[in-house]
């Protein structure tokens, strides 16, 4: 098998693999995770098909709390659901995360981690946002480069589906999220269909 390489940043890599395994995406943009939601919204608008042969239903809400509520509701209805967030936005999702984690719903959150601070203008990379959520019932995966953002993103989705468990897939905001590198391209549609 010939290995194919592409050049992409961490946000796009996570969005690419997420799109393949998602039926509903509840979104609200927040830096540095906004490009993930924007890519999924763009691909959905262009009619791109996911692994299941349908277009992802993207629902933009009024806040991160609304996006988490959308995820909770659609997961209860049986749809594979994803969201993308960071920092203070993740803090607003915690109440819904306890519900989703406690109900063993196969949620996946892709988090471009950023410092949680009273000064919302800080762009420093930090893990306080997702570490605050460690007791919500979500399993945690951490990627350190764009290649891992794609690979562990797929692991998060496949594990959530097979184990009926909620996952946070985290990586450093502004470092991994915006780092552009060449990596081995995972063709989720071709390599993962037999795993679902």
Predicted features and spans:
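Thiamine diphosphate
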Residues: 1-132, 137, 154, 173-174
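Alpha-helix N-cap recognition
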Residues: 63, 144-148, 152, 191
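Flexible, glycine/proline-enriched loop segments at strand-loop-helix junctions
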Residues: 136-148, 165
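Conserved anion/nucleotide-ligand pocket segment
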Residues: 150, 157-177
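A contiguous loop/helix-start segment that scaffolds small-molecule binding in enzyme catalytic cores
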Residues: 180
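Conserved small/polar residues in nucleotide/adenosyl-binding loops
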Residues: 184-191
């Amino acid at each position: 098998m010939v290995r194919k390489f592409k050049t992409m940043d961490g946000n796009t890599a996570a969005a690419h693999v997420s799109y393949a395994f998602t039926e509903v995406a509840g979104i609200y943009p927040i830096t540095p995770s906004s490009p993930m939601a924007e890519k999924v919204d763009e691909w959905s608008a262009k009619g791109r098909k996911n692994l299941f042969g349908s277009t992802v239903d993207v629902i933009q809400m009024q806040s991160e709390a609304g996006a988490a509520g959308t995820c909770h509701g659609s997961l209860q209805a049986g749809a594979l659901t994803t969201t993308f967030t960071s920092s203070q936005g993740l803090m607003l999702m915690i109440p819904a995360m306890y519900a989703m984690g406690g109900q063993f719903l196969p949620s996946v959150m892709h988090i471009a981690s950023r410092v949680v601070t009273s000064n919302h203008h800080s762009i420093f990379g930090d893990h306080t946002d997702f570490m605050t959520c460690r007791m919500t019932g979500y399993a945690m995966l951490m990627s350190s480069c764009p290649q891992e953002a794609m690979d562990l993103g797929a692991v998060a989705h496949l594990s959530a589906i097979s184990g009926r468990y909620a996952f946070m897939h985290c990586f450093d905001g502004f470092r991994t999220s915006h780092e552009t590198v060449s990596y081995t391209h995972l063709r989720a549609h071709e390599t993962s269909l037999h795993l679902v």
